């Protein structure tokens, strides 16, 4: 049996506020939606310009096959000792350096990739 829109509205109108809230939650879960109202932007409302990221984190995703070369590259970039650099490489994925400029991050990524590592900038 299929209900008409009028029958559904009438049935909802007979429910208490708490029952309607429960119904909304059930509908959100069932259909994977939210009941938040859509806000229409006026013509004068412009989207704010996306700020360019200024600080990056260099993340060693994978050391690759040339682990010794990657350890050397990590030591050069960070100034860490052999043991500490090896721990960073062995612990991949992990952070190599944080809060660096875009230029430094790109240079570090290039050096690590040339050494055989897979690198991400965040």
Curated annotation (Swiss-Prot):
The protein's name in its UniProt record: Large ribosomal subunit protein bL12
Superkingdom as given in the UniProt entry: Bacteria
Matching InterPro entries: Ribosomal_bL12, Ribosomal_bL12_C, Ribosomal_bL12_C/ClpS-like, Ribosomal_bL12_oligo, Ribosomal_bL12_oligo_N_sf
GO CC annotation terms, alphabetical: cytosolic large ribosomal subunit
Pfam families for the chain: Ribosomal_L12, Ribosomal_L12_N
PANTHER family according to UniProt: 39S RIBOSOMAL PROTEIN L12, LARGE RIBOSOMAL SUBUNIT PROTEIN BL12M
Complexes and interactors: Homodimer. Part of the ribosomal stalk of the 50S ribosomal subunit. Forms a multimeric L10(L12)X complex, where L10 forms an elongated spine to which 2 to 4 L12 dimers bind in a sequential fashion. Binds GTP-bound translation factors.
GO BP terms, alphabetized: translation
Family membership noted in the UniProt record: Belongs to the bacterial ribosomal protein bL12 family.
NCBIfam families, alphabetized: L12
Keyword Ribosomal protein tagged: yes
UniProt organism field: Stutzerimonas stutzeri (strain A1501)
GO molecular function: mRNA binding; structural constituent of ribosome
Function: Forms part of the ribosomal stalk which helps the ribosome interact with GTP-bound translation factors. Is thus essential for accurate translation.
Transmembrane segments: none
Keyword annotations: Ribonucleoprotein, Ribosomal protein
